[in-house]
Curated annotation (Swiss-Prot):
This is UPF0328 protein ECU06_0070. It comes from the Eukaryota. Belongs to the UPF0328 family.
Amino acid sequence: MNTTHVPEPHRTEQHTENQRHWRKILDIAPIVSIAFPAAMYFIFDEDSFEGSLFLRFVTVLLPFSYSAVQYAVLLHTNRMPHNKPEGILQSMLYYTLNLLLLAFTIISILSIIAFTLDEWENNDDSLLYSITLPSFFIPLTYLLSVSCRLVPGQIGFTDTGINVLIDILILLFPRTALVSKESKHRLLYAVLFLLPILIRLLKEKYCPSGKSSLPTASWRVAVLALILILVFFAYTFMMCRSMVILNNHFGLLNKLKRVSAPSRSDK
């Protein structure tokens, strides 16, 4: 019986090459996920969004897909056998982080459905879904994926040198965008977010910097905790808004009440 044998070095090289291409896609994805919906906001008016389900879907697809894929990748990496801890406290932290990553993935997918079904009846809705929300959660997702380590026993913020300053800029612009009342100012800060990302990508390509060998230092753990707290609030808001939209669209609460009513009457 003839069998085809693939040399182990070839498989390893192919796997490494695939990982390299996948890494390049994920590096560019946050830029595209911010720029594309912002461009859609500029090109189309609120009536166009309100009247087209497809247009709303295309606008929210990239940013929320990036979020879903990135958290799924983080979850997959965290669940690798060599990353599983042995101690009780470490295990509790490990499974809590995995549960959060899974929740963020599901919320991202749910948001694509819910925000597409929403009517976008005014300019505030268009601004929220195309600029404000992406410019808030994408920087957090990006930093969590490239600047932090989530493996128990090594948890912390890992960037060093000039990358720390770039990370501060990445966090600063979106936060300022949320407190700006004028839509043009929100758009400006959302666009400015692209600059530190581009600077970081170019720097890592031509002058890569190392990661901290002690990510568990107190201030590094505190930075990671801050990012996780911001992520938690961002995705809690997205989940609550998605549930309200789905309830308004499908009447989920009314259906649950009708289902539970007979059981209460039987008692």
